[in-house]
Design a protein with these regions (language model features):
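Long, well-ordered core segments of solenoidal/helical folds
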Residues: 1-10, 44-61, 93-112, 145-181, ...
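CBM-like carbohydrate-recognition segments
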Residues: 1-24, 36-43, 52-72, 76, ...
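Inter-helical turn/loop segments and adjacent helix faces that build the functional surface
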Residues: 37, 138-149, 208-220, 273-282
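Acidic/serine-rich, low-complexity amphipathic helices located in mid- to C-terminal regulatory regions
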Residues: 126-141
């Protein structure tokens, strides 16, 4: 595991000095491996990673609340895991600090969280995974029933403002102000359907529904959003490889390529959705086909015998400096790398779900 993610106990050069979302995704994947294996090394790895950042008073090294970056909420899921497992107060205090951010985080006029303070009036698909599973788990753990209406609202707004009626796919971002160059002046939507952005949204749904009270009136809305998403994702699955393209609706257009992190995210969301009864059983075959494609196309053994995950786009965003215009050409311009944490974390989640599925025949 340390070949793919730095171990803080070893003080290795290159260990992330900042509290980051990809860090949180990898740890969530390792948590699922620990739950399956109960190998203490995985638990210790998660705890060492969090202790690298969290002080005894619950403060988080390098985290500043007034950046209002929704990405910074995601690693808090490891804090909730550690608190529930160890009952150490420092993890509860640190999680409460992240929960406090959500109280004052800037919002659109409709009540949707901005992606970041530096991206005003914008909601991105990515942000739903960054914030809502933590928000829902925190609310369930510490008895905040009123929070669930707000959590459901984030998904309803994101789908309403980004879903394309023709394809069923969701545009990467939405700008309420229509001020960004990437935003459609009529709708505020960005121009393309990015695979990993939809993967983040899919994972956000299944992980959030897990914590929703079964009798909550908005739970059925979230399941309906997931079902619509699963239908669209299935429609754009490549029939030969079982994978999905970087720009989902462009298929074999010049420069487009099959991308690994989105595939891992879709496989996880579909398989888990079926297992937990959120999705019809027919999606199990879609997940299996996708997983077989991942194993065939993206898992490669190097000369040292180590398995690697290839084919992950390094990053994707909108606006900023240098400016990302959301064009087809932009999404194809980002580097494709090996063992990117966003791919590795999603692969661990997908693999554990598919292992569970294989034993439930």
């Amino acid at each position: 595991m340390t070949a793919l993610w730095r171990d803080p106990a070893k003080k290795e050069t290159g260990y992330p000095a900042k509290w980051t979302y990809d860090h949180g995704l990898v740890l969530k994947g390792i948590e699922r491996v620990w739950e399956k294996s109960r190998d203490k090394r995985y638990f210790d790895f998660i705890q060492r990673n969090m202790d690298h950042f969290v002080a005894d008073d619950g403060s988080i090294r390098t985290y500043t609340i007034d950046e209002y970056n929704i990405d910074h909420i995601l690693p808090g899921r490891a804090l909730l895991f550690l608190y529930k497992t160890t009952r150490q107060e420092k993890y509860k205090k640190a999680a409460a600090l992240l929960r406090e951010q959500l109280e004052t985080h800037p919002r659109t006029s409709q009540g949707g969280f901005w992606h970041k303070k530096i991206y005003p009036s914008q909601m991105w698909l990515d942000g739903l995974y960054m914030g809502e599973p933590f928000y829902a788990e925190y609310a369930a753990t510490f008895n905040e029933p009123a929070a669930f209406d707000d959590i459901a609202k984030q998904f309803v707004l994101m789908e309403r403002n980004s879903r394309d009626d023709k394809t069923g796919l969701l545009y990467h971002g939405w700008d309420e102000s229509r001020q960004q160059r990437w935003a459609n002046p009529q709708t505020g939507r960005s121009p393309n359907f990015w695979g990993r952005a939809m993967g983040w949204f899919a994972m956000a749904l299944v992980d959030t529904i897990d914590h929703f009270p079964k009798q909550h009136p908005k739970r059925a809305k979230l399941i309906a959003i997931l079902d619509r998403l699963a239908h669209a994702v299935t429609k754009y699955q490549d029939p030969q490889s079982g994978l999905w393209y970087q720009v989902m609706d462009k298929g074999t257009a010049k420069g487009n390529y099959l991308e690994s992190s989105a595939a891992c995210m879709f496989v996880y969301a579909l398989a888990k959705g079926v297992r937990n009864g959120y999705l019809p059983s027919r999606y199990k075959a879609v997940a299996k086909k996708g997983y077989n494609g991942i194993l065939k196309e993206f898992i490669k053994r190097d000369s040292n015998g180590q398995l690697n995950l290839e084919g992950t786009v390094n990053v994707g965003g909108l606006g900023g400096n240098p400016y990302r215009d959301g064009s087809y050409e932009y999404y194809l311009s980002e580097k494709v790398v090996t063992n990117d944490p966003k791919g590795v974390g999603a692969l661990l989640l997908a693999a554990t779900e598919m292992e569970i599925a294989s034993k439930r025949r």
